[in-house]
């Protein structure tokens, strides 16, 4: 996506679905894989799905590091959405539980917004500063990451978000 922002610079964006989270998908795929192994009949496609779902989170972290110039240290990152899917406060196996600690552990200042995930997120994601709205989270941020597809985020004015950021990277 290349959006015009003040100064004519485009917004740098990477579009990739993070992975499938929640408690059911990982539990069910692991159970299927275990059943196959117990019966000496591995289900390689299911085992591959499990591996890919985990690898996608790692690749996302690598892409975010690249967008930050090789390090999260000293960067401010706005994270929109921490629940595993919209319209819930459920964070079981959410991508944010892998990605946000990598940001914080790498020295980033993380500002997060989630319409329903703040209460759980405060316990599960230490070191995160919680904001009430995406525009406040994005102000002077070096990077903005959307981890959950809340309808509230679909309606955001991306040009307004980008123009408030230190560097327009989404």
Q: Where are the regions that the model predicts?
A:
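Structural/interface elements that position substrates and couple domains in central-metabolism enzymes
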Residues: 1-170
């Amino acid at each position: 996506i290349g959006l015009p922002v003040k100064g004519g610079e485009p917004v740098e964006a990477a579009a990739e679905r993070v992975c499938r989270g929640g408690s059911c998908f990982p539990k069910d795929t692991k159970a299927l894989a275990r059943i196959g192994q117990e019966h000496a009949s591995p289900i390689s496609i299911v085992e591959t799905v499990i591996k890919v779902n985990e690898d996608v989170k790692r690749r996302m972290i690598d892409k975010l590091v690249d967008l930050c110039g090789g390090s999260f240290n000293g960067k401010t990152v706005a994270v929109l959405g921490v629940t595993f899917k919209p319209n819930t406060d459920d964070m079981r196996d959410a991508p944010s539980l892998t990605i946000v600690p990598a940001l914080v552990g790498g020295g980033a200042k993380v500002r997060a917004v989630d319409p329903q995930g703040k209460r759980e997120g405060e316990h599960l994601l230490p070191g995160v500063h919680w904001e009430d709205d995406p525009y406040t989270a994005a102000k002077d941020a070096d990077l903005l990451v959307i981890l959950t597809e809340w309808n509230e985020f679909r309606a955001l004015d991306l040009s307004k978000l980008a123009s408030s950021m230190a560097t327009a990277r989404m």
